[in-house]
């Protein structure tokens, strides 16, 4: 199967999305989605999944550096369940330092990070998905 994966950098009002190539080797930036409520976000993700032959999502999991959960982790836990309930395969990927890595990449390319939050989310989602793919993925 050549089903693709979508990586998600989850936020309260927007998410950064990346997509795998059909062979699940490389993560490619896709888009940032702004949303007003979870129902709207889930609908948009379903549409994108259908358009791109996606059956699986990889969601960044925001643990603290000491491996403890925080408020955002609890929101991602709920989001994980909602995506699963839509009959997608959903995986969690440690996202610690993904935003910092995204900022570093942007600075190395002389891209300003200050007012470029969407670009940071997009690169962070790409880092999250690439980290997952690098671990080796079983064809679902």
Task: Explain the meaning of each model-derived region.
Residues 9:
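Conserved catalytic-loop position in the HRD/HxD motif
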């Amino acid at each position: 199967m050549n089903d693709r994966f979508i990586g998600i950098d989850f936020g309260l009002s927007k998410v950064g999305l990346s997509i795998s190539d059909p062979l699940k080797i490389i993560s490619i930036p896709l888009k940032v989605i702004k949303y007003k409520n979870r129902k709207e976000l889930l609908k948009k993700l379903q549409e994108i999944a259908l358009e791109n032959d996606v059956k699986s999502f990889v969601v960044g999991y925001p643990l603290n550096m000491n491996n403890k959960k925080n408020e955002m982790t609890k929101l991602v836990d709920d989001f994980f369940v909602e995506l699963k309930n839509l009959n997608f395969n959903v995986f969690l990927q440690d996202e610690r330092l993904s935003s910092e890595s995204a900022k570093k990449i942007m600075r190395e390319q002389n891209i300003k990070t200050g007012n470029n939050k969407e670009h940071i989310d997009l690169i962070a989602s790409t880092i999250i998905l690439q980290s997952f793919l690098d671990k080796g993925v079983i064809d679902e």
